[in-house]
Amino acid sequence: MTSVSCRSRHWVIGDVHGCADSVEALLERLPATDRLIFCGDAINRGPAIAAAMERIWGLVEQGRAVWLKGNHEQDLVTALRCGLWQGQPSLSRCDTYRHLGDSLCRQWLERLDHLPLAYWGKGWVATHAGFDPSTWQPDLRVRLGFWQHYDGRFGDVVIGHTPGPHVRHLRGIVMVDTGACYGGNLSAYCPETGEVVSVPGLRPESARPLPGLRPALLSGR
């Protein structure tokens, strides 16, 4: 896992899902001296997956950003190693594999496999989906179990994974996925100040349908 840096402020950024233009727009609005934490699922779904990956990785190499692993990155790593995508013998159903091709995907394999699972700040932690409440280890797919049982032990937990209409707060959990690839926004949250900066994601006519998630669980405040 990745520890806190010496930079004074951080911005935790929700699921990019191939929305490279939104990443560029967000970067224009965030101070160049602050550190960026991309909380996973940068790949799949959107129209500019390769561009988003290259841009984010460039920021990582510059020391400005951390890219956390999401379930989509883990699924691609698993698929490349076993030759199956979601139980099917063809990887062509994976958006990233289709966009990049086999050779380029395999060039990304080790980088994606070694992405950190969490970033620890002072009084807060960022991770993709939350923590397994039975072990309190990062879990890339957890939802309701973590939301219901989080006891505040890590301070604020800033997560992506579950899209909603705006940044939501739920008993010490801050949910920053605002559905960029679904016609919503790409949002960044500053855990030191509580500020939110959002830019438009895909235009509604180009976006994917929002998954059927329970609105009462997503609304927060």
Predicted regions, residues:
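N-terminal active-site segment of His-dependent metallophosphoesterases
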Residues: M1-R55
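A short acidic-Thr-Gly-centered motif at the start of a beta-strand
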Residues: M1-S8, E28, W57-V60, L117-W120, ...
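Acidic, His/Gly-rich catalytic cores of divalent-metal-dependent hydrolytic chemistry
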Residues: S5, H149-R221
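A general structural motif
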Residues: R7-R9, T33-D34, Q62-R64, K122, ...
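Active-site-proximal beta-strand elements of phosphoester/diester hydrolases
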Residues: H10-H17, W124-G130, V174-V176
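Divalent metal-coordination and catalytic microenvironments
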Residues: D15, L36, D41, G70-N71, ...
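Active-site environment of divalent metal-dependent phosphoester hydrolases
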Residues: H17-S22, N44-P47, H72-T78, Y119, ...
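Active-site neighborhood of divalent metal-dependent phosphoester bond hydrolases
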Residues: R45-V125, L144-H149
